Amino acid sequence: MAVASLSICFSARPHLLLRNFSPRPKFVAMAAMSEDPIREWILTEGKATQITKIGSVGGGCINLASHYQTDAGSFFVKTNRSIGPAMFEGEALGLEAMYETRTIRVPNPHKAGELPTGGSYIIMEFIDFGGSRGNQAELGRKLAEMHKAGKTSKGFGFEVDNTIGSTPQINTWSSDWIEFYGEKRLGYQLKLARDQYGDSAIYQKGHTLIQNMAPLFENVVIEPCLLHGDLWSGNIAYDKNNEPVILDPACYYGHNEADFGMSWCAGFGESFYNAYFKVMPKQAGYEKRRDLYLLYHYLNHYNLFGSGYRSSAMSIIDDYLRMLKA
């Protein structure tokens, strides 16, 4: 399985802390640290008796990726020598949540844990990708099916905090989507911009938008849906049967429209949206909210890559302030 390229959309940050992580038994860290926990898992729980080949997989700039070939099949392994296990544990929980919807294909996570010499790893299903970009209509349909199937009674958020690219993503549960998106998504990114760049202008205007954005959600029924969270072209692939595969998630439960927030970096076409909305019908005011969900990702790019993305974020904020007369 090829790891997603992060060349345009994300770069690395050194540290992430997740709150109250309690991993599920499917991929819990081993109680006793072995010299090589990856090899140990593959040769025990992975049911292999020998590892025949280990090859590197290119494309990522945050983690190292490897293809482990064994007599019990293949495994895809990511490692990071500078970040603790919380990042990969969050990814594993997201992959598992998507996998359990039995809708769109995702790599099945097997194990995430700590490396004895520092850093962390995740072992997952190896998927052999095809060369085609595949059927966008099928991608749209299956994404909608995942949104429809992935429900929770806990509200908006996720079991743990995770990462968007390499930026911490706060997922504390909330019963109010407008509050959650304003505080945990836009507000958090605006604070990063102020703290990192001293950008009080975008911070103040952004908070004015947050305080006045409620009318954009009038007459909208918002149910928490399981979102991929970082759906751009580098995190979308197709298997040998030309079935869509989504990977490297930043999962949480939110408004389904928020999963289109990276559409400017995903190449979604008309067939994608037509197929999606046949399963998850478009709601009133969708077009007015579209840029609000782009804004989160433009702000994240600003925080990760610098001023090249500031103008796009500020333009969206200014347009909404005019629209809302705020």
Swiss-Prot record:
GO terms for molecular function: ATP binding; kinase activity; protein-ribulosamine 3-kinase activity. Its main location: plastid. Keywords: ATP-binding, Chloroplast, Kinase, Nucleotide-binding, Plastid, Transferase, Transit peptide. ATP binds at E125, F126, I127. Transmembrane segments: none annotated. GO terms for cellular component: chloroplast; mitochondrion. It is found in: Plastid, Chloroplast. Residues 1-30 form a transit peptide. The active site is at D230. Belongs to the fructosamine kinase family. This is Protein-ribulosamine 3-kinase, chloroplastic. It comes from Arabidopsis thaliana.
